[in-house]
Amino acid sequence: MEIILIKPVRKLGKIGDILKVADGFGRNYLLPQKLAIRATEPNKELIVKQKHEFEAKDKQIREEVEKINALIKEQKLVFIRQTSDDGKLFGSITNKEIADKLSENVSYNIFHSNIILDKKIKSTGIYTVEIRLHAELNAIVTVIVARSESEVQDYLREQKNESLETLAESA
């Protein structure tokens, strides 16, 4: 299937690119998500005319996302949860919970589908989580899972000491 991208798609292309993709990928993902349109002759002509408009809109979105990124990258999300004696959570922390807490902290809607989490967080500790804000921009946040506030402070002190040791070794 031949398609024209109307939004940038990670690892695929940018606005206005004409690509051949698998039929299922085009029909089941790109077209319904309004990331692309079919590459017919009228659509090709239309895209040439509207390419600047799409690029301007994407630039505006990217600027907005960069503002959000500036707010997000300094965030440390703290989850206080009950655990067993060996530090395993009763339950887990999912990408939805991370998105909700992050949205609450930065006053922007972050969707759980934007949180890149290989597997659910099931034990205490410090985790780095990637957030996909735009096709070309990801942010990293720190997630701290602990039993109590004092344990959170211990984790933060440990992390600070490790970063100081790393600086001392590199100097």
UniProtKB/Swiss-Prot annotation:
Keyword NAD applies: no
Molecular function GO labels: rRNA binding; structural constituent of ribosome
GO biological process, one term: translation
Domain of life: Bacteria
PROSITE patterns: RIBOSOMAL_L9
Pfam families: Ribosomal_L9_C, Ribosomal_L9_N
Keywords per UniProt: Ribonucleoprotein, Ribosomal protein, RNA-binding, rRNA-binding
Any one GO cellular component localisation term in the record: ribonucleoprotein complex
NCBIfam families the UniProt entry points to: L9 (TIGR00158)
Record HAMAP family: Ribosomal_bL9
PANTHER family associated with the record: 50S RIBOSOMAL PROTEIN L9 (PTHR21368)
Function comment: Binds to the 23S rRNA.
Family, as annotated: Belongs to the bacterial ribosomal protein bL9 family.
Protein name per Swiss-Prot or TrEMBL: Large ribosomal subunit protein bL9
Organism from which the protein derives: Rickettsia canadensis (strain McKiel)
UniProt lineage: Bacteria, Pseudomonadati, Pseudomonadota, Alphaproteobacteria, Rickettsiales
